[in-house]
Amino acid sequence: MDLDPDIYEGIKEYSEKGETLFYDGRFSEALREYNKAYDMIPEPKQQWEASVWLIAAIGDCHFWLKDYAASLECFRKLMVEYEEYGNPFTRLRYGECLYETGNEQLAKEHLLVAYSMEGEELFEECDKKYLSIISIFKLQG
């Protein structure tokens, strides 16, 4: 099933604005645009592919705004409700947010899975501490 063309165009417009703002480092403004796009998706939102990438974009904005709890909820939603276990980026951000909210052991597990899926290049734009967490974890076994 496809989205209504008018709804799709609205989602696309807000998403493109959000993406431009995001890449300009204007994360709060990008978050507003992504939320507008997400709000346009009809219920049940889980049936629409656009929900997945918008939740990821919203979670990514929260991450860069250092609102790790809100970001964690977005990526938890992707993992649980949308079954995005096979998405390396989802695993990476989920692991980073778990770490930042104090759940280091579970964070290590998800970061290691992300690493095993995509390798070190997935971590290139991340704080180096996340890659070092995996190194320590690999040594500890």
Model-derived segments and spans:
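Amphipathic alpha-helical segments of tetratricopeptide repeats
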Residues: A37-I41, L72-V80, Y115-E118
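TPR/TPR-like (Sel1-like) alpha-helical repeat modules
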Residues: Y38, Y99-L122
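Flexible helix-coil transition and linker loops at the boundaries of alpha-helical arrays
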Residues: M1-P5, I41-W48, M79-E83, E121
